[in-house]
Amino acid sequence: VESVRLAVRQGEQDQILSKLTDSQTISLVRAFGHFFNLANVAEQVNRSKVLTDEKNATGSWLSRAVDNILAAQKISKDFDQKDLQTWIDNFSVRPVFTAHPTEAARRSVLGKMTTISELLQQPDSQTQTKRLAETIDLLWQTDELRLGRPEPLDEAVNSIYYLNELLQETVPEVLAEFASEVKRLGVDLSLSAKPLSFGTWIGGDRDGNPNITADVTRSAILLQNSHFTRTLLLHLDQLVQGVSISTKLTGVSKELEKSVLDDLEKLPEIESRYRRINAEEPYRLKVTAIRHKLLITQQRHADDSPHVPGRDYKDSAELLSDFEIMRKSLMANNGQLIATGLLERITRAIAAFGLSHAKMDIREHSDAHHYLLKQLFNDSSAEIINKELESTKVIDLTKLDEQANKCLKTFV
């Protein structure tokens, strides 16, 4: 790589490149690809260090923005506290994941690049150098190309890699900092607020892609839910270790006591050992029940079985309700630091991601919708649609052809 770079600068690249065999050319292209990827990782790590030093010296961009708002509030009457609360209540950022075959990267490669990034952030040492060399060697011997063109679910797995990383590390801390900073403005960010959420087109964007069917969309959503559950369980493992609060030493709310009893009754599969050793630790029992209900919810979606109240979660609101029960009990019983710490960070992350990990946008060309509506109602105008929505008559779906039926299956 270095020889070719030097030759290019000297205008002598043809002397090297013209003598390469096909195999050597492929190796050279791969080497340059890895070189640029590794250079990008090194630059990102260095940039991260610069930003961290800047944050430690002058505060984050968010804290500086809050400082500017506070300064403006002192000299301006254009907005008041009520305006600030309204703005924050309605504040919403929603990044959307998309996919393109040219941007697809194997998770094996992404994982190794992440390892290299983490190693570069460690102090220089012989161990660090050896592990960097080992990981780069593994990267070189890993085929960065899949055997075939990525299928929609392959692309979904690729985006989920980033969603998992965001849920596990970044988003809980970002939202905690956001809540802390806006509090300086006298604004409370409710735990159900969604200043940050995520969307995806992957598995739902069927506009011009015949491979995206209703089954593919459903599989992508199930995949997202299973990964959300898996990553959230890591947070719950941390939480269950932390909330070792004993009723011998502090009280708990009647609501929490009743909730735990209901959970234990409706979830008989919770091991008797957990019931016994955590008998005086209701928060641990509650988190254990949440864990079981999440796994049952995941299985319910996979099996397409009906919701069973008390055994699984109908939606994200029910999951958040369980966390709210714990929060209120902690706040009323000298557990404010715990309630506003790990528990709050997990709660805000759940509000951001929801059970589906990211909200899927279903995208389809309007012609497909009009085609379906014309087969159903012989018309696709807004007037006829409104009329049919108010009608109670049964619609005959057997007359739909394959094209119309494909569109219909997306929604029913």
Which residue stretches match the model-derived regions?
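Often metal-dependent polyanion-binding catalytic scaffolds in large enzymes
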Residues: 1-390, 396, 400
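C-terminal amphipathic alpha-helical interaction region
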Residues: 395-412
